[in-house]
Regions:
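Structured soluble/peripheral alpha/beta segments that form catalytic or ligand/cofactor-binding pockets
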Residues: 23-356
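Positively charged n-region of N-terminal signal peptides that target proteins for export
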Residues: 1-4
Length: 356
């Protein structure tokens, strides 16, 4: 508990940084070309970074499961001149969740640690993030994830089947009206999933498709931003769609964007005016009383579809690590009764304004 309190205190200090201190972080700059494999690794000079992995898989009985694994890195700018190895120069957090459509249950867990001592780290030359017995690592063919949560375990492999999808303008993704409100951002859609999930001692072999996001920034959100709605969809025809909107304090759209990659590889970058999220149905959490628009109509460029959740209750309580509540859930996309694809919907800032 003392370690957790120290971590949350460090995050709080980071949130109180003024604009001048923000300039002490590395900044997102136009014209920078992402370099792989280097940019698969961590970028510790930036304030915030995450590796976000979600997917739909089926077990041996044909049941649908939703998987989510996210690792976060934060540079709080606290005690950076302190020579002690215990100084919290870099903080790491992780969330994992398992949604079971058959039982309607959601299991989730979280981790938090200061980087160091070989127990928590995010390597810079490749994707290799570790907190104790939770890890996400790059392999020769893709990625491997190992999670030993309190109620479930993941031993999953993710094979790359498509090229990296650079979001925004060649990997620079605007997140607000000011140019500096941006991130470096790429995705890897249509990852082929294999491996096992263990729940209550029962090990199940699973297979399916996943989506990986890697994003880093030092000034992600405008001060008037409340949160965001985001989707990442593996389309049934082999294409991929990412779309988001940043909401202001009144619920309006402060900024929006996305990318649609066709099955033939052509990419269309979506401008703010081409993306629209319209709530169709809301769900209220019985635990927190927070209300989320779990079913949505989405317009992304020239396509329009409805999102329906695998199940309504996919709220994640991460107040013990990253200090917030959010809805992160498996969804299907349909248009005219036809399934267009499967993916994940993220809804933040519905409990309180999101602070990164």
């Amino acid at each position: 508990m003392k370690v957790r309190a120290a971590l949350l205190l460090a995050i709080g200090c980071a949130w109180l940084c003024d604009a001048a201190m923000a300039q002490d972080y590395a900044q997102v700059q136009p014209g920078v070309e992402l370099q792989f494999p280097r940019d698969h690794g961590s970028h510790p000079q930036f304030r915030t970074e995450w590796w976000y992995l979600t997917g739909w898989v089926k077990d041996a009985r044909g049941g649908d499961l939703g998987i989510q694994i996210t690792f976060f890195r934060n540079r709080p700018r606290v005690a950076e001149d302190n020579p002690s190895r215990f100084a919290p120069r870099q903080l790491l957090f992780a969330h994992a969740a398992l949604a079971d459509a058959r039982t309607g249950t959601l299991l989730h867990d979280q981790r938090a640690a200061r980087a160091g001592f070989g127990l928590a780290e995010a390597k810079q030359d490749r994707t290799d993030v570790l907190i104790d017995d939770w890890s996400l690592k790059q392999t020769g063919s893709g990625y491997s994830a190992r999670v030993m949560a309190q109620e479930f375990e993941y031993a999953l492999d993710f094979k790359v089947t498509q090229p990296v999808l650079l979001q925004g303008e060649r990997g620079l993704s605007r997140k607000g009206p000011k140019p500096e409100q941006a991130s470096y951002y790429y995705s890897q859609p249509h990852l082929a999933v294999s491996g096992s999930i263990t729940v209550k001692g029962e090990k199940q072999e699973v297979s399916g498709e996943a989506w990986l996001d890697h994003e880093w920034s030092s000034e992600y959100l405008a001060p008037q931003a409340q949160g965001w709605d985001w989707i990442g969809l593996n389309l049934a025809d082999g294409g991929a769609l990412m779309a988001f909107r940043i909401r202001d304090r009144k619920g309006g759209t402060l900024w929006a964007g996305g990318a649609l990659r066709a099955a033939d590889g052509r990419v269309r970058v979506l401008a703010p005016g081409e993306v629209r999220f319209e709530p169709l149905r809301r769900w209220r959490s019985p635990r927190t009383q927070t209300e989320y628009p779990v079913a949505l109509r989405v317009q992304a460029g020239n396509i329009e579809f409805e999102l329906e959740p695998m199940m309504d209750d996919q709220e994640l309580d991460s107040r013990a690590s990253t200090g917030t509540l959010y809805w992160e859930g498996a969804v299907s996309a349909k248009s005219g009764g036809k399934v267009l694809g499967f993916g994940y919907l993220e809804l933040t800032g519905y409990w309180r304004p999101l602070r990164l």
